[in-house]
Each structure stands twice: as structure tokens, then as C-alpha cells.
Regions:
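Bacterial N-terminal signal peptides that target proteins for export
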Residues: 1-11
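C-terminal motif of bacterial Sec signal peptides marking the signal peptidase cleavage site
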Residues: 18-21
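A short, solvent-exposed, low-complexity linear motif enriched for acidic/polar residues
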Residues: 23-188
Length: 188
């Protein structure tokens, strides 16, 4: 377990160093580049669970030096996904990833990504399903990155199912989704 946390810390620090080294220059350079956002899930021990599915209805990237992460869209966002797509997080362990979003965006600096989640379901191995109450349908991920002209930037987000699914002790044991999403890789 400690080795898993050490590996995750190493990956996060390495990703941060890579991101910071690629973050020079002005916030807008003219032209466009492409951003690809991939999704993965760290290995978990949910021995009675068959799947944890989430429906993502939006992936937005935010430009500029916005560090306040407003709760409403301030007009500085660019939508990469505008239609719902459902992902089973438990199929994304052991290094597996899936393309979450891809799109052409103005070249320049970006400060964060937002995932918008409309629903989530946990399915047990016996086939019974439990709807997960979503604590917040918006997940802001502060991650400065740069998209260069005529280049493709790629990042991977770890949506940690084990840390995200919680039991509500005060409301008859209902299940809650409190998304824990961490950037684990960035490249061009």
C-alpha cells in the first residue's frame, strides 16, 4: 500500500515538473493546437463490485491565469465534450486508459479542466445496482498546461473509484460519489 502511494506521489511530482517546464511564454500565441484528455483509474480492492460507471456530459478547459475556479462558467472555457458518454472506471485499471475528450483549441496556456458528471452507478457482482448520489456534478482539476501551435498535447486523469465512492453513515448507508480526480500524466 505504501509503495502504491509512493508511486502515485512520484507520478504526480513528475507530471507537475513536466507541466511547469512546458508552461513558458505568453498565454495566447495565435493559431491552434489539439488537446487530448485520457481517463484511467488506479487499481482498487472492491471485491464485491463489478463496475462503477459515470456519465460525463462535459469536459471543459479554462484559459488564462484564473486560479479562483469560479462555480459558474465565466466565459473563459472551451468545451471539448458536449454530449453524454458513460465510462466504467473499473475497466480502466492496470495502466488502461480511454479517450475522454479531444478537440482543437486556441494555442496558449490553460489553467484547469472541468468534468461535468450527470450520473453514476455501482453494480455489484450479483447484478444488483445502486445509484450513486453525486455530491457535486462539477469537478474542477487545477492543472496548468500549454497547447502549442500545430501540436497535440495529451494528459491523463486518474478518476479514483475507490476513493470517490463513499458510504453515507447518516442516511441509511446510501452511496455517494465524491469524485477524486488527479492528473497523472502530461505530454506532447
Amino acid at each position: 500500500m505504501a509503495r502504491h502511494h509512493a508511486l502515485r506521489l512520484f507520478l504526480a511530482c513528475g507530471s507537475l515538473a513536466l507541466i511547469l517546464s512546458c508552461n513558458g511564454g505568453s498565454s495566447h500565441t495565435g493559431g491552434t493546437g489539439t488537446i487530448q484528455v485520457h481517463l484511467t483509474d488506479a487499481p482498487i480492492d472492491l471485491s464485491t463490485v463489478q463496475s462503477v460507471t459515470v456519465t460525463i456530459t462535459g469536459v471543459l478547459v479554462y484559459r488564462g491565469s484564473d486560479t479562483m475556479m469560479p462555480q459558474v462558467d465565466d466565459g473563459g472555457s472551451i468545451a471539448l465534450v458536449t454530449h453524454p458518454e458513460t465510462f466504467d472506471l473499473l475497466t480502466l485499471t492496470g495502466g488502461a486508459t480511454t479517450l475522454l475528450a479531444s478537440g482543437e483549441v486556441p494555442a496558449g496556456s490553460y489553467q484547469r479542466i472541468r468534468l461535468e458528471i450527470s450520473s453514476a452507478t455501482l453494480t455489484y457482482k450479483d447484478g444488483t445496482e445502486a445509484a450513486l448520489k453525486i455530491d457535486s456534478n462539477k469537478v474542477d482539476i487545477p492543472i496548468p498546461f500549454h497547447v502549442a501551435v500545430d501540436q497535440t498535447s495529451t494528459m491523463t486523469l486518474d478518476f479514483d473509484a475507490a476513493a470517490s465512492v463513499q458510504v453515507n453513515d447518516t442516511a441509511s448507508g446510501s452511496l455517494i460519489l465524491r469524485p477524486v480526480v488527479t492528473p497523472v500524466g502530461m505530454g506532447s
